Amino acid sequence: MKVLALRHSVAQVYADTQVYVHDDIKDSYENAFLISNLTTHNILYLNYSIKTLEILNKSGIAAIALQSLEELFTLIRCNFTYDYELDIIYLHDYSYYTNNEIRTDQHWITKTNIEEYLLPGWKLTYVGYNGSETRGHYNFSFKCQNAATDDDLIIEYIYSEALDFQNFMLKKIKERMTTSLPIARLSNRVFRDKLFPSLLKEHKNVVNVGPRNESMFTFLNYPTIKQFSNGAYLVKDTIKLKQERWLGKRISQFDIGQYKNMLNVLTAIYYYYNLYKSKPIIYMIGSAPSYWIYDVRHYSDFFFETWDPLDTPYSSIHHKELFFINDVKKLKDNSILYIDIRTDRGNADWKKWRKTVEEQTINNLDIAYEYLRTGKAKVCCVKMTAMHLELPISAKLLHHPTTEIRSEFYLLLDTWDLTNIRRFIPKGVLYSFINNIITENVFIQQPFKVKVLNDSYIVALYALSNDFNNRSEVIKLINNQKQSLITVRINNTFKDEPKVGFKNIYDWTFLPTDFDTKEAIITSYDGCLGLFGLSISLASKPTGNNHLFILSGTDKYYKLDQFANHTSISRRSHQIRFSESATSYSGYIFRDLSNNNFNLIGTNIENSVSGHIYNALIYYRYNYSFDLKRWIYLHSIDKVDIEGGKYYEHAPIELIYACRSAKEFATLQDDLTVLRYSNEIENYINTVYSITYADDPNYFIGIQFRNIPYKYDVKIPHLTFGVLHISDNMVPDVIDILKIMKNELFKMDITTSYTYMLSDGIYVANVSGVLSTYFKIYNVFYKNQITFGQSRMFIPHITLSFNNMRTVRIETTKLQIKSIYLRKIKGDTVFDMVE
């Protein structure tokens, strides 16, 4: 949802939009909670409070004050990610299709012949990183840019089997216009750009697990971050390959040679980072015009020195000349050398051309070896061709996508490779590598061993759920890693499936109860965004591919009402109750009935079950930004840091009742996942709370009334306001609590309206208006380690007779309290108080 704050109402009506007027009687937290549970996507928030907007944004719900109708029209028609700390809106708006254009934030693409293959009459527009070049389009009171591009489709095309680019793009654009927007993918880059700088300010060692190509620019500014990926393809790995011949397959209709060169250099940069944790000088021989240098330098400040007879316009220093092996001595330490020399074929016949290529390959390799032979902190990526070669077994083979699969591949070398054993690799084996292997990632670091790193902050986004990881080891890591942000795939199934398919692999599934974390927040993507100064206009949906975000060691753990809080907890319930259910009171009715409380009069006002826990359990798929376990735990140790709002602390028994209702709901829905989750949350409540039950009571609290509007034959009809199991020396403690609660007890608005048979031979009158005070005094007794209340639900009633009688219904009648007392069962009254 998105909250668009206005000082005045607007005349126009918008679809899926609701108006909320700030309620001055309620504080900012209550207003934020009420707004978050509205069911439409767009909320027009009138007479807004800045504090309420701040609360919503910290909760991950995009909320922004608008100053003009133009701002409203722009934001209401699309989704966006909001940097509420820097006041920047990143739109995810594809309406530019109506201008017959596709967009890119990679400059090199604009220098290709891609426009020849676009839809008729369409053009390509460069918009800069995250749409930075579009800022001038929006003259708003806040910074605004459109981060939507088609780079994801272009890159998907490059790695796909498709060759017809126009048909591919047409299909993908139609899909984009008919399916739900993958909002997390669009905002993930914004998130990563906020996440890693903030982590590096606080942590010396940051480890990142499982980066992919979409992060290839993100980490250029962070050479000290240690990356873990799927490892490199080494020369020694070719032993598994059978020999093949030249294939000559075209990959792309437009020229992507620059993309290949960029990926090669980025691979070398990140390989260098892994070895030396600093930025290198980048030397390049050949590969002009290298327009992609603009992209790399746009993200991060690198020094490029290049040699080529052709121009290289974005190089820091360009030598318009050839480079020879004797020039190697000009190159400094702490550098990368990229060798991409290849003479144009011209009119040469195939045999002569092949001989030239092989000679150049050997020459390239000689330059690489000479460069690495002396000095320190060096990495070289060199262009090779399929031919009989002796190569170091530890050298890395690269084959990033290029326009055509021919005989070209690249070799990544470091100084250690020079001293390693060399192996003869036949030409046919190298063709087999070229024909069958595509390097899919610029990150080729070693795989992560799933174990605790005590001196590091671990970031593992979408990296550890795969079933090639041991599930128990992943859980152990999350439980024991003191500082981390790790995601795992949430169990969205109804049959409690332990793993589910994803693309061509399987993922383990998890619930929050699978983890025994200490001082960790378990939330959703949008809940996590709020912790890092971001919010989003589209909440997580139960797509089947959702993830829990688990943050260990955050200083926001105790700020229970600010981050990963209860906002939106009733939203799904409201959507169902007010559209599909038998009555809008259905949730209240079900919760009472499932706990054998049949007095439904005023059930929406006085409910015997925690709606928070119940909704968090049965609708966890729709809102898991609320960290339920943290909420329970902090209450159990009485360390809840509440900034504001009308706050009601639940008694532990209310939480147990909610779990019982949720379990019955799950059984009726045949939802095995909610059934297990509810059982495990109930077990967790019993673990963190030391709940004892007065199932064999020896004292009770009684309330006697001045007026009983029914006939009765007991001596003194009274309400048993809870039973206790205590030693006699604890009686003074109970009396002290009753005295403290005196005003609240006598202020109870107690009513009755009918009689019924509680069981055979027990005729009683119903009592309403006491449950909230009962749970409050339950909490006080619990915190003083006094056993109060039974394991079965407290059903307030007044015993009228021990004979079977007919039910009587009367107008709701207020009962006046005469006295409240503490009496020993089958004994005397030990304390009595009157108003």
From Swiss-Prot:
Domain of life of the organism encoding this protein: Viruses
Region described as N7-methyltransferase activity: 171-245, 429-555
EC number: 3.1.4.-, 2.7.7.50, 2.1.1.56
A GO cellular component entry from the record: viral nucleocapsid
PROSITE patterns: SAM_MT56_VP3 (PS51589)
Transmembrane segments: none
Localization (cell): Virion
Span list, region GTase/RTPase activity: 556-692
Residues at the active site: 718 (for 2'-5'-phosphodiesterase activity), 720 (for 2'-5'-phosphodiesterase activity), 797 (for 2'-5'-phosphodiesterase activity), 799 (for 2'-5'-phosphodiesterase activity)
Self-association state and partner proteins as the record states: Interacts with VP1. Interacts with VP2.
Protein task: Multifunctional enzyme involved in mRNA capping. Catalyzes the formation of the 5' cap structure on the viral plus-strand transcripts. Specifically binds to GTP and displays guanylyltransferase and methyltransferase activities. Has affinity for ssRNA but not for dsRNA. Capping activity is non-specific and caps RNAs that initiate with either a G or an A residue. Together with VP1 polymerase, forms a VP1-VP3 complex positioned near the channels situated at each of the five-fold vertices of the core. Counteracts the host innate immune response thanks to its phosphodiesterase that degrades the 5'-triphosphorylated, 2'-5' linked adenylate oligomers produced by the host cell IFN-inducible 2',5'-oligoadenylate synthetase (OAS). The host RNaseL is therefore not activated.
Name of the molecule in the record: Protein VP3
